[in-house]
């Protein structure tokens, strides 16, 4: 999901 300005790692 691209709802946050940083990627989920």
UniProtKB/Swiss-Prot annotation:
A matching Pfam family: Periviscerokin
Keyword vocabulary terms for this entry: Amidation, Neuropeptide, Pyrrolidone carboxylic acid, Secreted
Sites of Valine amide modification: 9
Modified residues (Pyrrolidone carboxylic acid): 1
Keyword Secreted carried by entry: yes
Alphabetical GO biological process terms: neuropeptide signaling pathway
Location, primary (coarse class): secreted
Annotated function: Mediates visceral muscle contractile activity (myotropic activity).
Similarity section: Belongs to the periviscerokinin family.
UniProt-recorded name of the protein: Periviscerokinin-1
Lineage: Eukaryota, Metazoa, Ecdysozoa, Arthropoda, Hexapoda
């Amino acid at each position: 999901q691209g709802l946050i300005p940083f990627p989920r790692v």
